[in-house]
Amino acid sequence: MPYLLEMKDITKQFGVVKAVDNISLTLEAGQVLSLCGENGSGKSTLMKVLCGIYPVGSYQGEIIFSGETLQAKNIRETEQKGIAIIHQELALVKQMSVLENMFLGSEWGRFGIMDYDAMYLRCQRMLAQVKLVVDPHTPVSELGLGQQQLVEIAKALNKQVRLLVLDEPTASLTESETAILLDIIRDLRNHGIACIYISHKLNEVKEISDHICVIRDGRHIGTRPASTMSEDDIIAMMVGRELKELYPHEAHHIGEEILRVENLCAWHPVNRHIRRVDDVSFSLKRGEILGIAGLVGSGRTETVQCLFGVYPGRWQGDIFIKGQAATIRTCQQAMKLGIAMVPEDRKKDGIVPVMGVGANITLAALDDFTGAFSLLDDAKEQSIIVQSLARLKVKTSSSELAIARLSGGNQQKAILAKCLLLNPQILILDEPTRGIDIGAKYEIYKLINQLVQQGIAVIVISSELPEVLGLSDRVLVMHQGRIKADLINHNLTQEKVMEAALRSETHVTS
């Protein structure tokens, strides 16, 4: 069968740096090819070349699509050829309806008069293809992330797509939403539509792919049939070494109780009769890693937001730090009590995107660098920034580079560096490795182990059960705002955690 896509000897440079170095790949119609590699490996750059974001002339090499040389000057030209890309950050206009988004820039009509009836029927057909049952007039802002993802795919299908590029499509989706998306991709494959799938979730890569292509440091390491590769094989090719144990677990001493929470309740910020956290009580000891598991909406994030003083609604309950009653209504109060937090949404709550990497790291500890007359000690601040970047292995060309320009993994490590400058006794990590590559995950896991060896208590929330089980000494399981189980992590399985989350009993301990 002739190839639908051939990329031959593609090289893309930024100055003297080769982001993509002589990469070639092929893809047949109806195939799914997964691209794997650490952040900064060149995956996204290669796809931007393919999709016309980097126009012909800005790179070396040749692209052949459907038997013809592709010389796209912009993304519109590649879309006209049948190539579409869906980014992790969705490109929908939230204030507009599903229908308006689907036809944005390609509206149907004559003489300046829109044919809304025809567009409505077409929109319904495209939504049916992705098995999404919503009214086309529904504002996108009223849809969940999984539904928005399907609208993006329907929008691509409306443009007669033949090759769909999906960049981290499930990073913010629940397990059920992910399952729906993977089913849609299988259906597209059965209809002859090819897909290039980029993801750090190797279980998904294995499940959905026909072939897996690994890129490292801008170079093509290898492409193999997915059926011949294990997750360990993929990891070894991605990082250039074998990770003997993804979740390194160093021996550490668990000490006395440092945190106790009693009868914590939190109400929905808008629908104030709804409890998001319902009578939650638990404790945490020095040097302990406490995992909190549960489905999305179970109350995990709301619980730790209360502990850090950032929950947006009304809440009540008793919090004790080292046996003393604590008042926490602001994050400043929490930090003074020795609590630091890496938030769930790093781009929204964890960084100031336009500020430099260094300025973000020291932002919460500026008092430590302030001398006489409230003047900032620049030399002292810069020294601490250099130490923090080295300790957390943050990869950046300059501490003054805007943090938004770093990869997700390096942004997360910079946020951790900011937290550690506070010398916390309790560190809360909400989805600490979401959307980051396997190498950066491993470094964060090692850091967590180092911190608990120093006696710091750590709370980890993750939607990835293997991560919770791989890191935690003890696991709290939450469901509908309540703690359903408090489990010692000894031979604990994913099945047992999910059973605890869904059972009818109010509380289980082990």
Curated annotation (Swiss-Prot):
InterPro entries for this protein: AAA+_ATPase, ABC_carbohydrate_import_ATPase, ABC_transporter-like_ATP-bd, ABC_transporter-like_CS, ABC_transptr_XylG, P-loop_NTPase
Q: Name one Pfam family in it.
A: ABC_tran
SMART domains from the UniProt entry: AAA
| Keywords on record | ATP-binding, Cell inner membrane, Cell membrane, Membrane, Nucleotide-binding, Repeat, Sugar transport, Translocase, Transport
Report the locations given in the UniProt record.
Answer: Cell inner membrane
Listed PROSITE patterns:
ABC_TRANSPORTER_1 (PS00211), ABC_TRANSPORTER_2 (PS50893), XYLG (PS51280)
Membrane topology type: Peripheral membrane protein
Task: Give me the residues that bind ATP, please.
Answer: 37-44
Give the matching PANTHER family. Answer: CARBOHYDRATE TRANSPORT ATP-BINDING PROTEIN MG119-RELATED, XYLOSE IMPORT ATP-BINDING PROTEIN XYLG
How does this polypeptide assemble, per the annotation?
The complex is composed of two ATP-binding proteins (XylG), two transmembrane proteins (XylH) and a solute-binding protein (XylF).
Task: Identify the NCBIfam families for this entry.
Answer: PRK13549.1, xylG
Spell out the family assignment given in the record's similarity comment.
Belongs to the ABC transporter superfamily. Xylose importer (TC 3.A.1.2.4) family.
Annotated protein name in UniProt: Xylose import ATP-binding protein XylG
